[in-house]
Amino acid sequence: LYHLNGSLKQRATGERLHKLISTHPNGYMTPQEFWELVVTCLCLRGNFYAYKVKAFGEVAELLPVDPGSVVPKLNSSWEPVYQVTFPDGSTDVLSQEDIWHVRTLTLDGLVGLNPIAYAREAISLAAATEEHGARLFSNGAVTSGV
């Protein structure tokens, strides 16, 4: 987390958010574990979600939420909302005030692309193309039919 001092960027070490993400993101994770989870979720799922636990109007903790248990949508005002299924099975619809959402490359501006699913489609297409080419050239590139 940085702030601009003229044309220079300086670490914002005095900011509450800097302390939160750099020293104590929540009660059970070190910053290293938290950021490893962020990167892992982005690489495997394309999205990372954290529930913002607030105290006195400030974010006090960031609790990771399984990307598979969150469904992002746009409400009638075109604002992102998140339908979350919690570990106890309860569900709730939360706003951006309550959820921190980090996404990778997106096609709709709302949901990050799942890199594995996207790669799977590309690999499947390449395999189908290879199979078609192999069949075509095994026949001397002569088409049958007419």
Task: Please annotate each region the language model reported.
Residues 1-146:
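Structured, contiguous alpha/beta core segments that scaffold functional sites
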